[in-house]
UniProtKB/Swiss-Prot annotation:
Residues 516-545 form a coiled coil. Keywords: Coiled coil. This is Uncharacterized protein VP6. It comes from the Viruses. It comes from Colorado tick fever virus (strain USA/Florio N-7180).
Length: 697
């Protein structure tokens, strides 16, 4: 089934997967298409791939594993596209070539090799290898004014493989016009066991500049356990890796070089799964990180009841999944991530790269506006009315001021003078004294009368002009008042018309609804429909971009959950009095999972009766159900929630595939109460002791 080169495979820590490869005719006569696809049971089926997640290279079929990579000019990188779960790349009509491909999800790498001339149009099954390996960073350490060496931090999960990693050969890969160029960065046997660092040979500044170290993340070629530079046999222990050059570090008393002088500028941005690759300058000092990693490992070991790492290593044959020496390298990698995220969070720059599905918010029917909507509209209407009233009062004040001016102007009345003249004439007629004086007086009165007549005419003239001005002012005021009333009326119509329509529609809807009981029933039915819609939305989100468990997620599962044997006090399959019990009838270990380092027990079905769960309680289910092809990510969960005291409220947050046949489902209790939970196709169940404990970031 597997190739002959697979004798070096370590089944306990590594495993194989397979791909289906075929040669299809292309639109051009001298071209053919290479089609690669993962089967539905594969770890990689359903992954959302980007063009930087996989590298496919072509080399002559006669190439041997002993050839020097630095002298080869025949290795070509192929361009590929991904559609309908198939990788497609164009190859020439000459099929005398070998293909080496490496794909990367998080810290897991899958590599396969095959000959083009052995493929058929119907598809050929090709097996490949995958391992959890994290060679996370490259650092150039300056030791003098013109001397330095390259260091690499590597984390390999699994003691058997890690103990065999006695050397590291690292090549930088540069794409030239027609081929890939390889430059050897590190060729080192032995490493620092504590830190995991490999230090290259001391080189000059000019020699390091010629190594083609990318400032950003790019593909490199690594050799871990093999003696040959090129893996053409499919052992899976020499393959391409995505690594980020993080910068320069100098020893004490040495002036470092500039990063721009050593690292090449970033040509294409690769979306890395390592969060700290975004801001490498935010990493903590390596000694601090290693110290924190040791503290974290010791805490986990003490929680399991052991005191030292040595005691834990002696018990490794019993398949302890948590805190063993196998996990130390993974903890180092996890701590690098967490230190970077903490630094970015303190700087308020951290944005999570990956989020899990959350509970959908409350959904309101847009056809029935809330009371707050009406209150806001009425408040706005009253504000407009108050503003209009203030404008009317301002016009009224101006009109009253004008009336006061008119009254002051008309205060001097000529009729009072005429009445005074009549009185004096009466006095003259009664006295009859002095005719001459009377004549003179009369003449004077006539003159005065003429002057008064002239004055009266002038006043009448002025009064006519004033009346015209007053009439003009009144007409202007009437026009402004009419315009204001029209504007106010339009505003009121604009405001009230939609409100009246909405109110009338709501009244009609209320009349159709009927009694209050019927309305309450409709609300309950609508709530249930919304809950179902929320679950469908979450399922669709998971189907479009299934969320895989990466290394740091698995490390957290190891630290928080583990397997039934390690956290027996936390696993409950029965209910007695006020606490859960874990009966010893679980049986023997079903199998030791090499993907999340867990021990599983085979259970056909499980029922937990009359259990009280607080709000926020997380339920972790591990299933082994293999679903039909085509509905792998659309199928609903098999969890059955029976009503006990009230309507239960448990929401499925995620459903993720952690191996070709294993799944992890995470549920959260949103409404506390007493439940009876029935599960099918369950391998293990984990309910945390603390309510509200979340296992995943």
């Amino acid at each position: 089934m597997a190739a002959s080169g697979w004798n070096a495979v370590i089944p306990k820590t590594s495993s194989y997967d397979y791909i289906t490869v075929s040669i299809q005719p292309a639109q051009q006569d001298n071209k053919k298409n290479l089609v690669i696809e993962f089967p539905p049971v594969s770890y990689f089926y359903g992954v959302y791939w980007t063009t930087d997640d996989m590298i496919i290279v072509r080399l002559p079929a006669s190439t041997t594993s002993s050839q020097d990579l630095s002298k080869m000019v025949t290795i070509t990188k192929l361009r590929w596209t991904f559609q309908n779960q198939k990788f497609t790349c164009s190859v020439g009509s000459d099929l005398a070539f070998r293909i080496i491909m490496t794909c990367n999800v998080g810290t897991m790498y899958f590599t396969a090799t095959f000959l083009l001339n052995t493929l058929t149009s119907t598809g050929t099954k090709v097996y490949g290898m995958f391992n959890y390996v994290s060679l996370s960073s490259l650092v150039v350490v300056v030791t003098g004014n013109d001397a330095a060496h390259v260091e690499a931090l590597i984390a390999v999960e699994g003691a058997a493989v890690r103990n065999q990693v006695a050397k590291l050969i690292l090549w930088s890969v540069t794409e030239t016009t027609n081929y890939l160029s390889f430059e050897k960065l590190i060729s080192k046997a032995g490493k620092d066991v504590e830190s995991g660092y490999y230090k290259g040979d001391t080189k000059t500044k000019r020699a390091i500049q010629a190594l083609s170290i990318s400032q950003g993340e790019s593909w490199y070629y690594t050799e871990l356990c093999t003696s040959s530079p090129l893996d053409v046999g499919g052992s899976g222990l020499a393959f391409f890796m995505r690594i980020r050059g993080v910068g320069l570090r100098s020893e004490a008393g040495v002036t470092p070089w500039k990063v721009s002088e050593i690292f090449k500028p970033l040509t294409s941005r690769l979306e890395s799964d390592f969060s700290y690759s975004i801001h490498p300058e935010a990493q903590e000092d390596d000694s601090v990180v290693v110290h924190k990693a040791h503290l974290l490992a010791q805490n986990i070991i003490r929680d399991l009841g052991y005191k030292t790492v040595a005691e834990l290593d002696t018990a490794e044959d019993s398949h302890l999944p948590v805190g063993s020496a196998d996990c130390l390298a993974a903890l180092l990698d996890l701590l690098y991530r967490r230190s970077e995220e903490m630094t970015l969070a303190l700087n308020r720059e951290y944005k999570p790269r990956r989020r899990r599905a959350a509970i959908a918010p409350q959904i309101q029917d847009p056809a029935v506006p809330a009371i707050q909507t009406y209150q806001n509209l009425v408040a706005g209407m009253l504000g407009e009315l108050n503003k209009s009233q203030q404008e009317v009062l301002a016009f009224k004040g101006k009109f009253e001021q004008l009336e006061r001016k008119v009254n002051n102007h008309l205060a001097v009345n000529p009729l009072t003078k005429l009445s005074r003249i009549k009185q004096r004439m009466d006095q003259f007629e009664t006295s009859l004294a002095g005719v001459s004086s009377v004549v003179n007086e009369v003449q004077g009165l006539r003159n005065s009368h003429g002057q008064l007549s002239t004055e009266i005419n002038r006043i009448k003239e002025a009064e006519g002009h004033f009346l015209n001005d007053l009439e003009s002012v009144r007409r202007h005021l009437q026009g402004e008042t009419g315009h204001l009333r029209s504007q106010l009326g339009n505003s009121l119509v604009t405001i009230f018309k939609p409100i009246i329509k909405m109110i009338s529609r709501d009244i009609g809807m209320c009349l159709k609804v009927g009694s209050a009981d019927q309305s309450q029933n409709d609300v309950v039915a609508l709530s249930s429909r919304i809950d179902r819609l929320t679950q469908e939305v979450v399922a669709l989100q998971n189907s479009e971009k299934p969320r895989l468990f990466y290394l740091h997620d698995k490390s957290e599962i190891k630290a928080a959950a583990g397997a039934l044997e390690a956290v027996a006090a936390h696993v409950y399959l029965g209910w007695m009095s006020q606490r859960f019990i874990c009966p010893p009838v679980l049986g023997t270990v079903y199998h030791h999972d090499r993907y999340i380092q867990g021990v599983y027990y085979k259970l056909v079905a499980c029922t937990i009766e009359m259990v009280h769960l607080d709000k926020g309680t997380m339920i972790l289910l591990i299933r082994d159900e293999i679903l039909p092809v085509g509905v792998l990510h659309e199928v609903e969960s098999n969890i059955v929630l029976d009503q006990c005291d009230h309507v239960p409220g448990i929401v499925r947050l995620s459903r993720d595939r952690v191996s070709p046949v294993d799944y992890i489902e995470v549920y959260e209790v949103v409404d506390p109460g007493v439940f009876t939970l029935s599960f099918s196709h369950v391998i293990a169940i984990y309910i945390p002791r603390c309510s509200g404990l979340r296992l995943l970031p």
